[in-house]
Amino acid sequence: MNDSEFHRLADALWLTIEERLDSWDGDSDIDCEINGGVLTLSFENGSKIIINRQEPLHQVWLATKQGGYHFDLKGDEWICDRSGETFWDLLGQAATQQAGEKVSFR
């Protein structure tokens, strides 16, 4: 994958997150902000989830209260380079914990 393809795929990931949060009807307020290629989810309790792109590595990084994760694109899924879990599963788990209610991005 070249840099422009990586950015196109990362942009699509950011857009999907925004769209899913816009259509989410949970009780918790989750704000989504994109600034300089960094996507920040802010929760009512003051906690945050930070998602950013690491262009030199062609990775997406996820920072949560539970820890940090690095994802490589394998096929059409972003996969954690340590656990093998998908980006969507880990993001959903972290958002659920930080929102205090079930949040799904699938």
From Swiss-Prot:
One of its GO terms (cellular component) is cytosol. The keyword Transport does not apply. The keyword Metal-binding applies. SMART domains: Frataxin_Cyay. InterPro entries: CyaY, Frataxin/CyaY, Frataxin/CyaY_sf, Frataxin_CS. GO terms for biological process: iron-sulfur cluster assembly. PROSITE patterns: FRATAXIN_1 (PS01344), FRATAXIN_2 (PS50810). GO terms for molecular function: ferric iron binding; ferrous iron binding. Keywords: Iron, Metal-binding. CDD domains: Frataxin. Involved in iron-sulfur (Fe-S) cluster assembly. May act as a regulator of Fe-S biogenesis. Belongs to the frataxin family. PANTHER family: FRATAXIN (PTHR16821), FRATAXIN, MITOCHONDRIAL (PTHR16821:SF2). NCBIfam families: FeS_CyaY (TIGR03421). This is Iron-sulfur cluster assembly protein CyaY. The lineage of its organism: Bacteria, Pseudomonadati, Pseudomonadota, Gammaproteobacteria, Enterobacterales.
